[in-house]
Amino acid sequence: MNVHILLTQSIPCHRLSLVLNSDTASRPAVRPVPTTGAAPAARWSRARWLLLFATCIVIALDGLDVSMVGVALPSIGKDLGLQAGALQWIVSGYVLGYGSLLLLGGRLADLLGRRTVLLVALSVFTVASLAGGLSMDAGLLIASRFVKGVAAAFTAPAAFSLITTNFEEGPERNKAISIFTTFAASGFSLGLIMSGLMTSLSWRWTFLFSVPLAILALVLGFFFVPKDARERGAGHDVVGAILLAAGMLLLVYTVVSAPGAGWGSLPTVLGFVVAGALLTAFVILELRVRHPLIRFGIFRVAAVLRANLTAITLFGSYVSFQFVLTLYLQDVLGWSPLGMALALLPTGLVVVTSAPFADRLIDRFGPTVLIIVGLGSLSAGYLLFLRLGTAPVYWLDVLPPVVLLGIGFGIGFPAIQVQATTGVHDDEQGLAAGLVQTSAQVGGALALAVTTALIAGGPAAVGGHDPAGLAEQLAQYRPGLYLSAGLALAGLLIAALPRRRRLAVQPG
């Protein structure tokens, strides 16, 4: 997601009000669905609810695809004859497409129209899902995952900016964002559960499951997503977009490849150097062009910077933990995919039941308090998992931390979204959405890559048992749990840092 700047942190909600570039006044305003002030959600029209539902399906699909494939990897490898190295790219291919193009997707949503970008990208996502489910070889399967990630990089910020431009800032928008992020959090959390259930039938259903949902979102979007004005009179900064996408793509690719190639190998070092050069060139260009893709002045706002940093730590810790948990339950305990799905069911249920209350809590306490509570719950959950052995008692050893993780993600993620986008002008809501989403996805990609390097077996652990014994194998996974706990605690520290009460930054 993406952002802009004058900061006014009001006492109850620590709101952000941003001063835009000097040419903002000449930009056309996006026409929202008619609303009566800050009317409560109960009085929203049928069209308003269907607009919200369409965007919620989109973001739930994005969340599902991030987490859903993990449980199916052993079955995919057995069916297609793939080794662990190839299996890793089924996961990382999606992350590469998603994490490297989110900012570009958010900006294009502003420039080309959110409705247009959403419908086109969602159509591509649907076709790629179908191709993945019908794939008979690894190349097509990995390619379809990459294309789905690229499509999701455009659907996610477009969907979120449709929320922020069609619901007025305040209780109305907080309510809509709470519902929206409930679907996002639930989609991500329920991805492992659905994958466990469907893998018992066939791994292909973990890919085909998205097709009917995507078609439903397309139909609703076509009829109920209003046409919005495009930003006119501003350059598209095509060179900047190319530099950013290329730099991010190479950076994520290098991080994902490093565990296999070696962190000190020539390809890895060269990849980091070239990626750094591309991103440095992007920053220099953005500081000089008249209409930049990103106005870096927004990072002078403490709340915006804090929201993006906590997004990195929250999502990174969660992705890392789910990866380790999948290996722990299947490789150490020998659980079936269905058994793992049932064990994780409380997480999804807690997310679904806690996230809807986030908007009320944000209105009362402000997003910062909710972020602190959320990251605190996640930290406690990860630390509790560190005491697990090879024969845990589910009700005593697994269920309590699972519930804490659901609470932490369910209230922490909506609060981060609100903090990062409040006060952003309509024509840059897509950018604001893209910046936070990019932070979250890049955090997840980096954490996953580091996790595979930290655990002794790495990706090779998928699909096989360590002959040295269950205890030794469990010890191999503990560094991944330490990483998750460390990231969550770092995010908690960032969220709790003292903040300035008022800061104004002039545009430019």
Can you say where each PLM-predicted feature lies in the sequence?
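C-terminal membrane-cytosol helix-exit motif in multi-pass small-molecule transporters
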Residues: 211-230, 245-257, 274-289, 491-499
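Transmembrane-helix bundle of Major Facilitator Superfamily
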Residues: 20-223, 371, 376-379, 383-386, ...
